[in-house]
Amino acid sequence: MNWQNKVVIITGATTGIGKATRELLFDNGCTVYNFDIIEHDDKKGSFIKCDVRSRQMIRDAVHQVFTKEKKIDMLFANAGIHLFANMEETTDEQVDDLVTLNILGTFFTVQSVIPIMKAQKKGSIVLMGSDQSFVGKGSSSVYGLTKGAIGQLTKSTAIDYAPYNIRVNCICPGTIDTPLLHKAVDRFATITSKPQLEVLESLNTIQPLGRIGKPKEIASVVTFLLSDENSFMTGSLVSADGGYVCQ
């Protein structure tokens, strides 16, 4: 695919999967905008400070991109947080944080770009799901709730906007070597008094491929989902999890 002059917004693209996707799209010739609260430390794309928990910040950031570029071709709504806790261990504040960022932040980001893509009569959107969009895991009640919601948001939005040639798909990674994973590992190690290396090794052994994934491996799938080469695919939840959910 010719990526030249394609304009893409990625939320949460300073670290992890968002960063890997930003770098890959930039290297392929895209004009990339990173909406994040922490600025990236390289020159691969433009940074706009945006906390996706704020509806107004999202709308202002999208307006800033559209004013400059006159179009928005693609969106990867990636920003999110993880929480390793069961229901009794979860505070009211943590529930609010996860729902506001993972669900509402995604919803309002998509809502802000949809009118632009409708006017263009074309657009491609990828939402960040999880293996927990398909299966349950222990100590993940609120996080799993948010990722199940993202799966349904993907399907409903895909149906609503297919007549406008806007495709909406969902990438559902498994266990990936990101800062979010290491925070979860740290918390689990603290709770269980197990060494962090032991926890990480246990994560490797439960994957059919025998290892956790790398951000670049997910970025390559996201890039395909965003691309015009994927023009007949919409409303799909795509696993990239080393075979975890098929066990």
Can you name each region flagged by the protein language model?
Residues 14-15:
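Conserved glycine-rich cofactor-binding loop
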Residues 88, 135-141, 163-164, 210, ...:
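Active-site loop immediately N-terminal to the catalytic Tyr-X3-Lys motif
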Residues 130:
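Residue(s) in the substrate-gating loop at a strand-loop-helix junction
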Residues 162, 167, 233-235:
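Short, small/polar-rich loop/turn modules that mediate ligand/substrate recognition or access, typified
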